[in-house]
Structure formats: C-alpha cells, structure tokens
Amino acid sequence: MDLSRRDFITAIGGLAATAALAEGADCDPSASASACRSEELQSELITKWNCETESVSPQVYGRYMLDGDTRGFWALDALERAFEKVMREAKETTVAGDVPAVWSVYNMGYIVKTRESLFSIDLKHRRAHSLVPLLDFALVTHKHGDHYDVNFCKAMDEADKPLVSSFAENAAFDEIKAKAVAGGKPDVFKIRDVEIRTFRVDHAKEAWGIDFTTAFEMKIGKFRLLHTGDCGVANDKLRVEWGHPDLWLLFPMTSLDVTDAFKRIRPKRCAFGHLWELGHAVGKGRATEWHIRRGLDMAARAGGKPAVAFWGDRIC
C-alpha cells in the first residue's frame, strides 16, 4: 500500500476501526483507534510519521512551544490538529460502561474519560492548560519536561484540582501544591470512579534513574489500565497487583527489555507512546523507525498485541 500525502492525512485524522484487537475490551467502531488499524496501514504510517517528524529539530520545536507558530512543518500542524481533535471528542464522548475512552495527545500524554471522570496522564502540549476546565484530576509520572507542562500544572493548582505526581516540588514550579507520592512505597487511593495504585519504577539503571518514575495502575470498574511512564528497567519493581491490564501505555525504548517486560505484565493489549518526542534529537530520546519496529516485533513475539499511539488517536 502506498499512501498519498492526502490519504495519509485523512488516515491519521479519521480512520474508522477495522477490527477488534483487544481481548476483553472491544474497540469502538466509531473511533479512530490505533488498536484497530491493520498492520499494513500502521506500517505505512510509521514510515510517513518518521519522515515528517525528522525535519523538526528540538530547536524548531522549542520555538513553536513559545510562540505557537508551526512554521509550515507538517508535524507541528499535526500536533495542533491532534489537540483540537482530542478536546472536541472528549467533550462529545459519553462513556456508558467500564471501558474508558482513551486518547493519545502527544508523547506519553493521554486523556482518559470514564463514566464519571475526565483525567490526564503526563499531558504535554503547548495548549494543555486550556483543558483544565474539563478535567477532574491529572497524573504525572516524573519530573522530565516532556511529561508535564508548567502552565498546565499551575492552572490545575489554581483550579484546586488534584495533581498527582511523584514530586511535591520542582525547580520549574516550586509553588505547585501537588500530592506527593511517598518515596518508593506504593500508595492506593481513589478519585471519583478511578482507583489508583502508584508504584516506583526505574527510569534507567544509573543512580539518577532509580525509583525516578511513578507508574499508575488503575481500576475503572472491571477495566484495568496501566501507564508506566519512562520505565526503562524490567525488574521486580515492574509488576501489577490487580490483574493483567486491558491496556498498557508504555515507552518501548530507554533501556527497557521489551520481551521481559511483556512477560511480567502480560497485557491484553498495549499502545506505544514517546515515539516522536520533538524535544529530543533523533536517536537520542526520539525513537527511530528501526527502534519502533523492533519494539513492535518484540512485543508481538511476547504476545503483547502492540499498536502505535499516533497523536490524536482514540485508543479505546
């Protein structure tokens, strides 16, 4: 299949679901769900996205974050379109059962809607603060700038809405009164209809990366959702207590042994994020096409039913 540029843009913005990938959670037939794309189309899109994002350097992305000017770069236009799409669909979508609606915004940032709640995980976007009036709470896995937005966190605090993070203070916004997750000790709490278990995982094997990331294991009725941030080590810390997740949101790079990780978690399905993080240089935190395909292959061999979360995708 050879997609034209016009067909490519149409495919990422409005592709109808073609087949259910998940066991235990069916894809919404009206959703542009990454989990429901054919492998052939996903493969084409990976190549196209890789090509389009390579032209955006961290410096260009940084200027866009300051002034909002996309400067004609397709990837930055796509980032704006993705945000508009997610905001519109989050307002319009009604969730009736336990299966939440989950959208990919950018990087490891997601919006989740349940019957009673709307919340974010690692939301990072130039306009993230404009979602605050809609959200009930927000989760942040760790204090790297590609996983949280300062203006968004300030706005959540000013709106007196819960911001759950692994750090109570940070040099970028000391005044934020976030809920601190204590040390490496797991914590379990409930916000509205979402029960949340936090546990520390290692971002890297080096000293700075030990216990650096807080993972979130969530119960939404009978649905199990897992977000592990930038977990980079598949050791005994990486484990679930509430059963195999219906959906695992993960970053398949850093130093993570994908095969070992999937054997430990055994998700019913998963979505790869953090693949085209424009603040990183290509191959230095920004995944290459080779890394993405290798991760997908390793996850598939481990029975993980992997899919790529493109910006703006509705995953569930």
Residues covered by each model-derived region:
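Binuclear metal-ion centers of metallo-dependent hydrolases, dominated by the metallo-beta-lactamase
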Residues: 175-194, 210, 263-316
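Active-site-proximal loop/helix segments of hydrolase catalytic cores
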Residues: 124-125, 202-265
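Metallo-beta-lactamase
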Residues: 2, 7-105, 111-130, 135-137, ...
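Divalent metal-coordination and catalytic microenvironments
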Residues: 112, 142, 196, 230, ...
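Short hydrophobic/aromatic beta-strand or adjacent loop that forms the aromatic wall/cage
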Residues: 107-109, 186, 211-215
